[in-house]
Amino acid sequence: MNILQNLKKSDPIISNLINSEKNRQETHLELIASENFASMAVMQAQGSVLTNKYAEGLPQKRYYGGCEFVDEIEELAIERAKQLFDADWANVQPHSGAQANAAVFLSLLNPGDTILGMDLSHGGHLTHGSPVNMSGKWFNAVHYGVDKETNKLNFNVIRDIALATKPKLIICGYSAYPRTIDFKSFRSIADEVGAFLMADIAHIAGLVASKLHPNPIPYCDVVTTTTHKTLRGPRGGLILCKDKEFGKKFDKSVFPGTQGGPLEHIIAAKAVAFGEALQPNFVNYSKQVIKNAKVLSSTLINRGIDIVSGGTDNHIVLLDLRSINMTGKVADLLVSEVNITANKNTVPFDPESPFVTSGLRLGTAALTTRGFNDEAFIEVGEIIADRLLNPDDLLIEKECKERVLSLCNSFPLYEAKLESSIK
């Protein structure tokens, strides 16, 4: 059964658009920090007949018949997730990281309770109490940021805020923080004020799984994550904790609390991705992700472009473009013109609006999946610097695009293994 050939026959418009997106991915340098390239096996699992199956409830406790095989699949996904993160309990049903966070909030909080998370403009996430998100509308959200001098977490300041506001839940884990998170210090603050502690490790899950970043499981009451980004699986969510009885609360908050039927085709793809991440070569991949980020950061610094916090400990490199008198909006456009995909991003204490910003966020997970190494990332950094430092030079723009295409040809995506219908 050739699903892609069937698609080409039944809906050539969608087939052609998928083909266009595949070609875009092949010919661009993907540096969006929240993106990665799933394996063929992951994509095949999520494109399988499992999409036909409804399975409300948990394995062995379904509200529908015919679930014997999806039960086995989901149980395998749960066990692999637990093994991967040294957890005692896992729920693999959340459709996204945001859904996972919502389920945790439903379990632990009542409307009006105080939550303490990082300010979005300092590297937090919408679901950590932003006023435009449900988390900021239903709860009394207060925020901490980074130190103005170091752009790193200052636990003395965070402790003072927690003591003054007495949050019921403290959230750590970020979308644009390039440094190691000290979960033990957060645990100490949470204990002092009597708060629950939640870690959202969506960006660093793959590094945690590879034991290249501290594991939050021993310190946090609950851990949420996405399953893509550095974990390199399908788009989806995951909840983990060390207390099985506590975990039962989250089970009920996922279903029936915030979701109906689980997406068993995505859960199968999660199981495949977790299995891949349990292999020794995934640790090597994660090591290269961090190494590449450090190389990219140092290359840009050497060209006179400031990096928030002076470097990185993970996959994120956050450029502070005030050092070259440029906005994130302009930089995003400039690199896109030479086939580099990134995103404008606020930096701590940013004078610009979120629609303009002073930063550009880069990530190394996707290109590392393509096989990019230290040498390749030096070239990536040089191309970015050449483009940003010479925004009006059309010759340099042309040369930068040619260099990008040369890199793409040197590190092909999927190595032409996709079906011919989308080649």
UniProtKB/Swiss-Prot annotation:
Cofactor needs: pyridoxal 5'-phosphate
EC nos: 2.1.2.1
Example GO molecular function: pyridoxal phosphate binding
Gene Ontology BP, a term: glycine biosynthetic process from serine
Main localization category: cytoplasm
Gene3D superfamilies recorded: Aspartate Aminotransferase, domain 1 (3.90.1150.10), Type I PLP-dependent aspartate aminotransferase-like (Major domain) (3.40.640.10)
Pathway involvement of the protein, from the record: One-carbon metabolism; tetrahydrofolate interconversion; Amino-acid biosynthesis; glycine biosynthesis; glycine from L-serine: step 1/1
PTM annotation (N6-(pyridoxal phosphate)lysine): residues: K229
Annotated localization: Cytoplasm
Keywords associated with the record: Amino-acid biosynthesis, Cytoplasm, One-carbon metabolism, Pyridoxal phosphate, Transferase
One GO CC term on file: cytosol
Presence of the UniProt keyword Transmembrane helix in the record: no
HAMAP family: SHMT
Description of how the protein assembles with itself and partners: Homodimer.
Family to which the UniProt record says this protein belongs: Belongs to the SHMT family.
Summary of the function given for this chain in its UniProt record: Catalyzes the reversible interconversion of serine and glycine with tetrahydrofolate (THF) serving as the one-carbon carrier. This reaction serves as the major source of one-carbon groups required for the biosynthesis of purines, thymidylate, methionine, and other important biomolecules. Also exhibits THF-independent aldolase activity toward beta-hydroxyamino acids, producing glycine and aldehydes, via a retro-aldol mechanism.
NCBIfam families in the record: PRK00011.1 (NF000586)
Designated name of the protein: Serine hydroxymethyltransferase
Organism this protein belongs to: Prochlorococcus marinus (strain MIT 9515)
Name of the encoding gene: glyA
